[in-house]
Amino acid sequence: MESIEYAEGEYNSTHLEKMSTIVSKLEENGITVIIDAHQDMFSRLFCGEGAPKFYVDKLTYSTDCNTNIISSIFGLFSACIPLSKNKWKYDENGLPRIEDCVAGSFIDYHKAPELMSVYDSFFKNENGVLDSFVNFWKFVAKKFKGRKNVLGYDLWNEPWASNLWIDLKSLVPGYVDNHILSEFYAKIDEGIAEIDPDYTMLFEPIPFPDTLPLFGGHALDAFKSTPVDNTIRKQMFNVHSYCCAADQNVCKDGEPTLKDATGNCAEFHDRKLKKNKQQAKDIGVPVIITEFGACSKSEACYYEMLGFEKAADKYLSSWAYWMYKAFNDHTTTAAENQEGIFNPDGTLQSFKEKALSRTYIQYYQRQP
């Protein structure tokens, strides 16, 4: 997003044109594309990526960990550590240096009050920032309208919860989805539909507490209805499934162990995909899992992938593998031989190729 809207109302058409060229080349090779408004941790200011700096400049956010019964309840799951406690050094643009960012924990950053509260301000359109985001999507939709290989638009990647340290209701599974995100998605949809009324919306639930990292990990209630009436808009329930979300200790060393990958992880993916499939059915849309994997070059990675795919076949769920490359940005800092599917010399990581080479079950079995 920040690479396209570099200043309020100012868009980088050259960058978008390069994206369009890539999409065209993929179409020539029979590859389907999802246009994803990708972000993690909202902004470079918070050691993440996604939103332009002017978004943060116009939004209010808290640096305080409120000590009350609500924070005590949430404290059962994690500790509140403000980002201001990190001893980051900043560059000439006032942004934390990547060397300092990667020294901390991606998970811990998500628990910070600054991050939770800035999401809350954004979702509520403080100072018209959400209006700016709608205009961003309208600009993008003009470029990709009618493209045959574009499956749909993922409106916002992994929306984080409102400030869990303050708002007790946000700890209730499904509350943020139904009372904040539905309205958020509907507002974006209204803008996109002015440009591309035939597009397909992909909408995501919040990762926590909709997925609870206790007792082996469980997917809980999310949306009770689609953000927009199904008779008006094509929509897909878009979820992610990572074993690290099953329990706080599963990925304490970075990734699941081989023992977890062949046992607990497979069970978690089965429970989660079963619940997600039922949720999608209840609200009358298909489900798609657009992120799983993102694991390193290891035997454990291979078996976790197989466990996930077995569950996806069982529940007839479409999926896409998520991979990182070593681009050295703030949230994709994987080593060259990890998390992607290529080795540094350009050859494929054969075990991942093997794990991902699966027949499309609905094609050869038809609908059950």
Task: List each model region and its residues.
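Short, solvent-exposed turn/loop segments enriched in Gly/Ser/Thr/Pro and often Arg
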Residues: 1-2, 37-45, 154-160, 205-207, ...
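Aromatic-lined substrate-binding rim segments of carbohydrate-active enzymes
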Residues: 1-60, 64, 134, 138-144, ...
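Surface-exposed, active-site-proximal loop segments in enzymatic domains
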Residues: 2-15, 47-57, 113-126, 164-173, ...
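Aromatic- and acidic-residue-enriched segments that line the glycan-binding/catalytic groove
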Residues: 10, 40-120, 336-339
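Membrane-proximal envelope and lipid/glycan-remodeling enzymes
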Residues: 17, 21, 26, 120-121, ...
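Extracellular glycoside hydrolase catalytic/binding regions
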Residues: 124-152, 156-315
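Aromatic-rich peripheral "rim/lid" segments of glycoside hydrolase catalytic domains that contact
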Residues: 225-227, 238, 299-368
